[in-house]
């Protein structure tokens, strides 16, 4: 069995199919792991969600910020913008089933035998594996509740800098987990998250900011970390234990697939902007 990991698809369904054809992906034998952000901006979020749902246990995805944003739009907590490119998905007959399927997806997945962890944006350097498991499980539990829109989705984001507080309770604790695992790029030296800078490290001019993966972390030493979210990196992190897979397909660049067993990246150029 082969394990394939794909970067942010964001509705680029044709490119996804093309890159899977290049490796002869067989869902009866192989697994497709996705770093999240299956939807938004690209031309066919509906087909993308339907495809991943149809794969059953052969698909392993985590939630990204755009997937959570879709839940907010569907729940009428946010308005969809033209740039979201979600109208066909929101009008689909099976939208409720697709949203329910998304709600079952976690914020982190792991392959223990490979010492590999996958999240959308990264892992806070302060967290141990046990903390990561615990905090992501709390969010997953909240997403599966009937009141998930009011209790979680309506309060999940903040644009103020947040720092991990082990004693935090309730929504503050859940919110840090969501913001860290789905939106994080840079941290201040005191551990606060920064949401403003999206540039690659070589272009960041604030001396107080460092990429999350440059901080000392027990998980950085022991595990391979697979993530997406940060298209500006274009996969360039210069560390064999970091697999940055968002290579900006929805922005006109390309989609990246990583074959775990061969440690090989396969790419598909964006075919058509929409």
UniProtKB/Swiss-Prot annotation:
InterPro entries: Ap4A_hydrolase, ApaH, Calcineurin-like_PHP_ApaH, Metallo-depent_PP-like
GO molecular function: bis(5'-nucleosyl)-tetraphosphatase (symmetrical) activity; phosphatase activity
Protein origin, superkingdom: Bacteria
GO cellular component entries: cytoplasm
Alphabetized Pfam families for the sequence: Metallophos (PF00149)
Keywords linked to the UniProt accession: Hydrolase
An individual GO BP term: RNA decapping
Keyword Protease: no
Catalytic EC class: hydrolase
Catalysed transformations (reactions): P(1),P(4)-bis(5'-adenosyl) tetraphosphate + H2O = 2 ADP + 2 H(+)
Family: Belongs to the Ap4A hydrolase family.
Name the UniProt record assigns to this protein: Bis(5'-nucleosyl)-tetraphosphatase, symmetrical
Organism, scientific name: Shewanella sp. (strain W3-18-1)
